[in-house]
Structure formats: structure tokens, C-alpha cells
């Protein structure tokens, strides 16, 4: 009996992408990563006169061995194993394939590095880094935008994609709240600091009118009057980070990590931090307790005469 109902690899990948978008409600970036990983596998199999539909466990293992030989990091290979497993599990459940060749596929162990965290003064300094009002209206608008975005990244712990996707109607300055569309299209309401309220208000009053394209509800824009993309935000954060903290790699996720760690160090309940971050599982949030514990030990070793 044939493994595949009448669908070729491209059709399978399109159907799987639809499943990820419509049923699992994953972000476009995550779906693109799945497609890239699976297309690499499909290309490898085609050279071996096989296909996604006719792949065997042995061929999948050969593909992963090739990835290792090519020098891919363990984390990248582990991600590809996850994509392959998800694809074949879906294909069998959906009736596209009769068997799952990835069932016994092992995932390489990945060292779980603790996230990079800034000191409170460093994070606050970064949020306040954009220069004061410039003579040029556009440059003044950019500085106001950057300050508002940085306050949301550190002051509210938003993901870079969540900041990029913000619309004006999701900001409630009177209540100091923002309605965030997170992973899996899940909404959560997050408080924003007084600093963020002031920064966003200034940007809305002075900066955004200078940058916004007509009839767009997006909150942030780039200098070309297009919505401020994830790539734009990463570049902006790295630029300020390189100026204020030379030699340190600072990303939007660094600010999110710092937000979570500083809350826990201040005594916040881990379940509350989980809700603020939008984590589906508290286990994801618990990694920040390890960071806090490490910093506690470092403080002890620095300060105690018997350490």
C-alpha cells in the first residue's frame, strides 16, 4: 500500500504550513523556520532519489548526520529534529501518510545556557539612551519612537514581535495597560510603567504624526513610513547597546530576560511573571530563577568576608 495519498512534497508542505497557521496558530516566522528545515530535508531526500513521503528512518538519520558534518550547531539540528517530528506526526494524523519514520529519531542534547541579563542600571540606561529632541523633526520622531519601544521591551518584557505588531488601539495610557497579541495569537493584558506611559504619550503626540503612513493603525514606523519590523527593532536595540555597553551583545530578548529577572529579584511571584511574559508553562519562566540564584551567589562572594 502506498505511503502517500496523491500529494507531492510541495503539496504536503503547503498543507502542513496551513495546519501550523490555522490550527496551531504559530507566527509567520516560526512557520517559515519549519518550511526552511523541511525543504532542506526534501532536497537531501531528492538527491537520494527519495521524498518526504517515502523517507525511511535510516534516510532521516543520514540527513541529520550530514547536518552535523556541515558544522551546524546542536541547537539548529535539534530544531530540525523537532520540525521533522511535528511534520510526520501531523501527516499521519491527517491521513496523508501511513507511517511515521521519525518516531525513534533522537534529538541531540543542547546545553541550556542561562539568558544574558543586564543590571537594573544598565537596562534603565539603555531605555533612556535615545537622544533628546533634535532640530530635525524626523530625527526627533525617531528618538521618541526608540524611547517608547525600549520602555516596552524592558518595562513590560514584550517580545520583539509583540512590539512590532502593536497597534494604537491596543494602548490604553489612562489605565497604563497594553493588550498584547502573543504566541499562538493569544492575547494578554500587560501593565506599562510610568516611564513607558510618558514615552508613548510623547511619541503619539509629536513623533508618530511625523512618521505614520496614512490609514495605518500600527504604533511604530521606520523612517520610510513603513511599520517598524522585528528586524528594525533588533537593529535599533543593538545600535544603542553597542554605544552604551561596548563589547556586550544586547538584543530585544536581553531586555525581556532582564525584565523577568529583575521582577523575580524584587520578590514577584513566579506565576505572575509567567502571566506577564505570556509563557504557556511555568517551567519556561523558572529558568530566570536560576539566573537570580546565580546573581545571589555572586553577590555573596563579592560582599561576605568569609566567602
Indicate where each model-derived feature is located.
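Conserved catalytic core of the tyrosine transesterase superfamily
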Residues: 1-307
Amino acid at each position: 500500500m502506498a505511503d502517500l495519498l496523491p500529494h507531492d512534497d510541495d503539496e504536503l508542505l503547503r498543507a502542513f504550513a496551513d495546519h501550523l497557521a490555522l490550527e496551531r496558530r504559530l507566527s509567520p516566522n516560526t512557520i517559515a523556520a519549519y518550511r526552511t528545515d523541511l525543504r532542506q530535508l526534501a532536497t537531501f531526500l531528492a538527491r537520494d532519489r527519495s521524498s518526504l513521503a517515502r523517507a525511511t528512518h535510516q534516510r532521516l538519520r543520514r540527513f541529520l548526520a550530514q547536518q552535523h558534518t556541515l558544522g551546524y550547531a546542536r541547537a539548529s539540528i535539534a530544531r530540525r529534529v523537532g520540525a521533522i517530528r511535528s511534520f510526520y506526526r501531523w501527516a499521519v494524523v491527517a491521513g496523508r501518510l501511513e507511517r511515521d519514520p521519525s518516531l525513534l529519531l533522537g534529538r541531540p542534547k543542547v546545553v541550556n545556557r542561562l539568558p544574558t541579563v543586564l543590571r537594573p542600571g544598565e537596562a534603565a540606561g539603555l531605555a533612556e539612551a535615545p537622544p533628546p529632541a533634535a532640530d530635525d523633526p524626523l530625527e526627533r520622531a525617531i528618538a521618541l519612537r526608540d524611547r517608547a519601544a525600549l520602555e516596552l521591551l524592558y518595562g513590560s518584557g514584550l517580545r520583539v514581535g509583540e512590539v512590532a505588531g502593536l497597534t494604537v488601539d491596543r494602548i490604553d495610557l489612562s489605565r497604563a495597560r497594553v493588550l498584547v497579541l502573543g504566541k499562538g495569537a493569544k492575547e494578554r493584558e500587560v501593565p506599562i510603567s510610568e516611564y513607558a506611559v510618558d514615552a508613548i504619550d510623547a511619541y503619539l503626540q509629536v513623533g508618530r504624526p511625523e512618521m505614520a503612513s496614512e490609514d495605518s493603525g500600527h504604533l511604530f514606523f521606520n523612517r520610510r513610513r513603513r511599520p517598524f519590523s522585528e528586524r528594525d527593532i533588533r537593529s535599533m536595540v543593538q545600535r544603542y547597546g553597542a554605544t552604551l555597553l561596548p563589547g556586550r551583545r544586547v538584543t530585544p530578548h536581553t531586555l525581556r530576560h532582564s525584565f523577568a529577572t529583575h521582577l523575580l529579584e524584587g520578590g514577584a511571584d513566579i506565576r505572575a511573571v509567567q502571566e506577564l511574559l505570556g509563557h504557556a508553562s511555568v517551567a519556561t519562566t523558572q529558568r530566570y530563577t536560576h539566573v537570580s540564584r546565580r546573581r545571589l551567589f555572586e553577590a555573596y562572594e563579592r560582599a561576605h568576608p568569609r566567602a
